[in-house]
Structures are given as structure tokens and as C-alpha cells.
From Swiss-Prot:
Its cofactor is a divalent metal cation. This is 2-C-methyl-D-erythritol 2,4-cyclodiphosphate synthase. Binds 1 divalent metal cation per subunit. InterPro entries: MECDP_synthase (IPR003526), MECDP_synthase_CS (IPR020555), MECDP_synthase_sf (IPR036571). CDD domains: MECDP_synthase (cd00554). It comes from Hydrogenobaculum sp. (strain Y04AAS1).
Amino acid sequence: MYRIGIGQDAHYFEKGKKLYLGGEEFDIGYGLKGHSDGDALLHAITDAILGALAKTDIGTLFPDKSKENKNRNSVDFLNKALEIMYDMDYSIVNLDCNIIADKPNISSVRDKIIESLSRLLSIPKDNISIKAKTKEGYNKEDSLEVVCIALLQKMI
């Protein structure tokens, strides 16, 4: 049996923060504003997994009003979704993600992000797609958005 889920997240940029994408840290002078570390890619992946399982969402599991989640590493969120997934005897077949932003240049860090996700998700790099899209002027806000689709398969 297969299940498919979609996850989405968006954050504004904030100067002076480190940027976290896919569990990797980039010190480029700005990061993503958020209650946690702001890793929009991991947030979207987490929600895609939870959605495929027809379970709760990241905001319910880890409320942004909770002091416990302040500056929390988004890998914790992903690990909880993976725990739920494994408990239900599912595994990830593949992941397809779009990062929509005018900055940073995703093509220069894509391989590093895919390597990180491969390690975190325990799936081959060939099963992970990270695509960069620009906003084409439709939104002048200084932000980054991610949309991910996760395909899961029941383990035999």
C-alpha cells in the first residue's frame, strides 16, 4: 500500500540569523524567522510525512506558543514524524520538494542539502528531489516557501 502526503511551510528572512535548510546550517548573514530554528524544508517534509499517514500536523505536535519549542532544532520535529511512520510500518519511497525564493542560490547548496536529507531520512540520494524556483516578481516580500510531496510505502 502506498500513501502520499504534501507539506508546505514559509518564513520571512531575518538578518543576523543562521539559515537552516534540510538540517544543514548556512552562515550567509540571514536566516528564516521562526519560533524554532526556522528550517522550512524540514517543516514541510515533516508535514508531508504526517499528511501521508493521515495523522496530525507539525503545529499540533510542536506548538509555536510552547517555550519548549523556542529555537528548537527542526530535526527533532522530523524525527517524531519518522517515529510515527515507522510505528505504522511505513517507509519513505521518495521525496519531491520545491524551494521557492529569490535567495539564496539553492543550486550551489543542493547537493549538501540532499546529502543531509539522505542521512536524516535513511533513503538514497537518488530518491530525493530538491528543485529551486524563483518568485518571478509575484511576491516582493523577503521570504522563502517550501512545498514537498512524500511517497510512503507499507513495509512488508
